[in-house]
Amino acid sequence: MLPGAARSPCLRFPRRFAHGGLAAPRTALWATAWYGIHSKAFTSANSPLRKDASKEPALASNSKTTNPIPTQASASVNPPKDARNATTAKKDLLSETTLANKEQRKADWAIIKEMAKYLWPKDDWGTKLRVGTALSLLVGAKILNVEVPFYFKSIVDSMNIDFATVGGTAYTVAGSMIIAYGVTRIGATLFQELRNAVFASVAQKAIRRVARNVFEHLLRLDLNFHLSRQTGGLTRAIDRGTKGISFLLTSMVFHVVPTALEISLVCGILTYQYGFQFAAITAATMVAYTAFTITTTAWRTKFRKQANAADNRGATVAVDSLINYEAVKYFNNEQYQVARYDKALKAYEDASIKVTTSLAFLNSGQNMIFSSALAAMMYLAANGVANGNLTVGDLVMVNQLVFQLSVPLNFLGSVYRELRQSLLDMETLFNLQKVNVNIKEKPDAKPLQLHKGGEIRFENVTFGYHPDRPILKNASFTIPAGQKFAIVGPSGCGKSTILRLLFRFYDVQEGRILIDDQDVRDVSLESLRKAIGVVPQDTPLFNDTIAHNIRYGRIDATDEEVHKAAQRARIDALIQKLPEGYQTAVGERGMMISGGEKQRLAISRLILKDPELLFFDEATSALDTYTEQALLQNINSILKEKKRTSVFVAHRLRTIYDSDQILVLKDGRVAEMGSHRELLDLNGIYAELWNAQEMSLAQDLEFERETERDDVESKERDMAPGPKAQQ
């Protein structure tokens, strides 16, 4: 049995309990002590979590959290209008809302204009040269394509003789035309393939730049945005959007303009060679074909949007289920998750069927229009041959020219359909780039200078995730430089919010936060966040090796520095025992290692970063008592050695009783502040909480002593000799 001084005062309460595969901190004792001290119960008025989020599935409603983070239901639906940090009202990027035709066209043109910047960048002459070369090759290919029917006409007319009477061979009669015909077709194909090869790097470079810009923008967005988004659906939408970039660029350069050029050439040739009737039929066909295609495709757009939205929902359910695999298993909800996924698949199936059937209608209408035009032109040409005005070669040439149009026309129809699809897929991608970055640094922001050693001062700070539910209310306190500072209080009182405000995940609504007399809003974000190190309550780990996760604290750290950081966090010995050592994979979100190991990896990462300001948010809640005490001793030695300003957020008072200053929060206000001894002498909230935890510890010790006595007595009875048998 461990000595009483080393034991946790919370042993009677569960250290952690399973929730979604994560280890939750022990907050039950705080709630018990707090309710026992005060007659009126604490409500969750300060908590940003909505109580009425009952429209979510039952599994979600069973889970509770004490972390004051706005949920999607609250943060994105009712954001504060007057808070600089709050997310402004915005439409759901993954929704299936169908815009009016005028609005949709406006959105499409905005995307096309944006992509034109990547197609013809101002300062990239290499890209401009490639685009210009590709366009030249394209024009050459189209001209050669239009020349092919002329050679075919000449071949037919040349061969329309009586060889028995005239004599000669096919080579002597039409040899040059046949060679020209073959060379022209080969040249057109060669130009097209060269065009594709030249333009390939332009499209791929644009995809990379757009994807990089979107990803960079996502990382700049505030915490509230990421907490309210559906990761699975968002990643699926981004993936579709990036795939649509290549098609959009190719369509802009190689399909829309070239098809218009080819149609103009054919109409001009028909008018010049055969009269206005042929050109009129061609022009009318183009107008009818284009109008029918655009109208029908616009009608089909809503079906594609519904399919995309269902696809996003399915991806969201799948990703959430796999990430929270343990929660699904703990509550035997496999069939529930399968039913949710199948519901999204059914919606996608229904929308896809509508897409396919409407596509059949579109294709049928296009073929009817074109076939009618072809029949009309063939009649005119045949009538001209019958009247002696045209030759058989002219009939063949008209047929060839019309069929020459069929390829770009049919292709234009499919291109327009795919173009609309690409624009829809890219709409989410470009809407992401329009989401405002709420936390910005000033143009004249300067690097943070810690000339006083890292003194932190909150001056009349008021903040709430929602206007009607403030978390901090006119809070003022100072964290002296180089001291160990602790923040305690009930769940939802704003302890973790203090860290988020200091780190500038959010900005205060009133008051200001100073570090060495510098407002955090006046310094650069990079220097501010570089100076702060955090061990969060829920340790974020990447699906990579242990070494990578520790080195994430300082990317350029050597292996030796990584090992030293792990030693100081008392996890090196454990890592060395693993078969693959530091190259052991931790799994998705670190699920392959225990909660205590995750927290020690987080502390290793913090030690490696070596920042001036340290924050520990229940950093040892998942550790056993012995490891916790040993690790705290190491942390305290580091703090004393380097004289770092450190802040500990804790529920178990025995882990922070040696702090230089302890701040007690109540209802978002500073209730008490002082050293452990001063707060006990004050005989206020802190003293009552301490006594409640000590009483719990005493009860634990008495219970264990009674258990041990019972065990000893039981063993003695078992070993005592029984009554002698009668002789």
Curated annotation (Swiss-Prot):
Compartments (UniProt record): Mitochondrion inner membrane
Molecular functions per Gene Ontology: ABC-type transporter activity; ATP binding; ATP hydrolysis activity; ATPase-coupled transmembrane transporter activity
InterPro entries for this protein: AAA+_ATPase, ABC1_TM_dom, ABC1_TM_sf, ABC_transporter-like_ATP-bd, ABC_transporter-like_CS, P-loop_NTPase, Type_1_exporter
Binding site residues for ATP: 465, 489-500
The entry's keywords: ATP-binding, Membrane, Mitochondrion, Mitochondrion inner membrane, Nucleotide-binding, Transit peptide, Translocase, Transmembrane, Transmembrane helix, Transport
Record-annotated ABC transporter domain positions: 456-692
Domain of life where this protein originates: Eukaryota
Presence of keyword Transmembrane: yes
GO terms for cellular component: mitochondrial inner membrane
Annotated region (Disordered), positions in chain: 46-97, 702-727
Binding positions for glutathione per the UniProt entry: 300-304, 363-366, 413
Residues annotated as domain ABC transmembrane type-1: 131-421
PROSITE patterns the UniProt entry points to: ABC_TM1F, ABC_TRANSPORTER_1, ABC_TRANSPORTER_2
Residue intervals annotated with topology Mitochondrial intermembrane: 153-175, 273, 380-394
Reported function: Performs an essential function in the generation of cytoplasmic iron-sulfur proteins by mediating the ATP-dependent export of Fe/S cluster precursors synthesized by nfs1 and other mitochondrial proteins. Hydrolyzes ATP. Binds glutathione and may function by transporting a glutathione-conjugated iron-sulfur compound.
Subunit details: Homodimer.
Similarity comment: Belongs to the ABC transporter superfamily. ABCB family. Heavy Metal importer (TC 3.A.1.210) subfamily.
Name of the protein described by the UniProt record: Iron-sulfur clusters transporter atm1, mitochondrial
Species: Aspergillus fumigatus (strain ATCC MYA-4609 / CBS 101355 / FGSC A1100 / Af293)
Gene behind this protein: atm1
